[in-house]
Curated annotation (Swiss-Prot):
Origin species: Homo sapiens
Residue numbers spanned by region Disordered: 1-47
Protein's name in the database: Putative protein FAM66E
Entry's family note: Belongs to the FAM66 family.
Domain of life: Eukaryota
């Protein structure tokens, strides 16, 4: 059960749910095919 920080980060990065809960993360239409997640994640990032 030894997972390095890079491994765990990469695993979460591939998880769609991580994109929603990751603060400061700005997805692009190319990485996120779902426009719903894109808009939902961009709203809280707006000042």
């Amino acid at each position: 059960m030894l997972a390095s920080g890079a491994e765990s980060q990469d695993r979460y990065r591939n998880t769609p749910s991580s994109r929603i809960f990751t603060p400061g993360f700005r997805p692009t239409p190319a990485t996120t095919p779902e426009p719903g997640i894109y808009m939902f994640n961009m709203e809280p990032s707006q000042p």
